[in-house]
């Protein structure tokens, strides 16, 4: 099972696009509060199009709540502060990919707690980061590639 965890997402368009990616890939979407929008926001719904019925979504009050319910086995933290290329991470089996909020990324305490689980998408040094929904899509499809695209058709 592939789990996409958005920690304090701020932009409804991004979350909607990520929900659509989750719907198309069978990944479960986890949202960790606070959210920068109402989950019923029309922009969230619009970006997810008519795929919402395919999205398995759970909302948590905070990261402690998320970890209490899901544990921390086989997690990967997507961060511009990571040193491990995302393609070098073993994303087979039941994996959770954590992504931080658009303006600040994942909290420092979380990165410090799991320094060997911080992965990065390579880019030119002048670029700070990719759009959140693009980052989720890139790493999601790498995880699915490593898992031989379970339940997906060409």
Question: Which ranges hold each PLM region?
Answer:
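Post-transcriptional modification and biogenesis factors for structured RNAs
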Residues: 1-154
């Amino acid at each position: 099972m592939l789990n996409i965890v958005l920690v304090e997402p701020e932009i409804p368009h991004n979350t909607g696009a990520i929900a659509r990616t989750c719907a198309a890939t069978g990944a479960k979407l986890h949202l960790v509060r606070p959210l920068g929008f109402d989950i019923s926001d029309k922009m969230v719904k619009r970006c997810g199009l008519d795929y919402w019925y395919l999205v398995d979504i759970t909302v948590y009050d905070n990261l402690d709540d998320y970890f209490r319910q899901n544990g921390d086995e086989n997690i990967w933290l997507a961060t511009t502060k990571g040193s491990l290329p995302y393609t070098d991470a073993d994303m087979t089996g039941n994996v959770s990919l954590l992504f931080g909020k658009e303006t600040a990324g994942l909290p420092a305490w979380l990165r410090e707690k799991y320094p060997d689980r911080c992965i990065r998408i390579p880019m030119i040094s002048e670029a700070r980061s990719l759009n959140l929904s693009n980052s989720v899509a890139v790493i999601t499809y790498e995880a699915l590639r490593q898992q031989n695209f379970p339940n997906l058709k060409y």
